[in-house]
Swiss-Prot record:
Name of the protein in question: Large ribosomal subunit protein P1
GO CC terms in record: ribonucleoprotein complex; ribosome
Keywords from the UniProt entry: Ribonucleoprotein, Ribosomal protein
Family stated for the protein in its record: Belongs to the eukaryotic ribosomal protein P1/P2 family.
Superkingdom, taxonomy of origin: Eukaryota
Keyword Chaperone: no
Organism: Populus euphratica
Length: 14
């Protein structure tokens, strides 16, 4: 529960 959230947030915030 860290890489998934960071990846999703980074991709969405893009």
């Amino acid at each position: 529960l860290g890489a998934e959230i960071s990846s999703l947030t980074l991709e969405e915030a893009r």
